[in-house]
């Protein structure tokens, strides 16, 4: 990766919860591991291009998750959102496909790096925890952070 892109990646993860909770050293290390991909309108991710890859963070653009069976909408994401966590430990076929609704720049955090952060950082671990009550608590912490940022504290 071009080292001149690192400040942009660092800035992005510094404003993307839960990665905003990492210390400076963790953010530096994480930024160096992120892969950058670009996708055009109408492109799709599915199966081996989605399952088992990592966490996809949308830098710019809009995507939809669509059920493979009937094409129905599962979710819609835009800049600052993440997707792919439910597919991170899968191999082969994915549960859904991702369709790009416009040209999109993705930051991809490899699954081994995300697993390391989940294990080593409480905020990241809580955010991606399988237990609903822990995830909800993490979301509450995120809401508090956003409110504090809006107030300028």
Briefly describe each language-model feature range.
Residues 37-39, 77, 109:
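Hydrophobic residues at beta-strand termini and immediately following loops
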Residues 103-114:
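A short hydrophobic beta-strand segment most commonly corresponding to one strand
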Residues 4-5, 10, 85, 91-92, ...:
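Short leucine-rich amphipathic alpha-helices used at interfaces
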Residues 26, 93-96, 112-152:
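A small-molecule sensor/coupling module
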Residues 20-41:
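Short proline/glycine- and basic residue-enriched helix-capping loop/turn segments at helix->loop/beta transitions
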Residues 1-7, 11, 17-25:
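A short, N-terminal "cap"/entry segment at the start of jelly-roll beta-barrel domains
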Residues 18, 43-103, 129, 133-135:
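Cyclic nucleotide-binding regulatory domains
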């Amino acid at each position: 990766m071009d080292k001149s892109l690192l400040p942009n990646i660092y800035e992005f993860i510094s404003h993307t919860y839960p990665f905003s909770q990492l210390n400076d050293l963790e953010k530096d290390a994480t930024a160096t591991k992120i892969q950058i991909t670009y996708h055009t309108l109408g492109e799709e991710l599915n199966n081996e291009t989605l399952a088992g890859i990592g966490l996809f963070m949308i830098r710019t653009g809009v995507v939809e998750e669509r059920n493979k069976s009937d094409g129905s909408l599962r979710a819609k994401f835009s800049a600052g959102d993440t997707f792919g966590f439910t597919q991170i430990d899968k191999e082969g076929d994915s549960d859904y496909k991702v369709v790009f609704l416009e040209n999109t720049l993705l930051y991809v955090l490899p699954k081994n790096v995300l697993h390391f952060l989940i294990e080593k950082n409480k905020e990241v671990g809580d955010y991606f925890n399988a237990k609903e009550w822990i995830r909800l608590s993490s979301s509450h912490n995120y809401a508090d952070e956003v409110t504090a940022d809006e107030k300028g504290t």
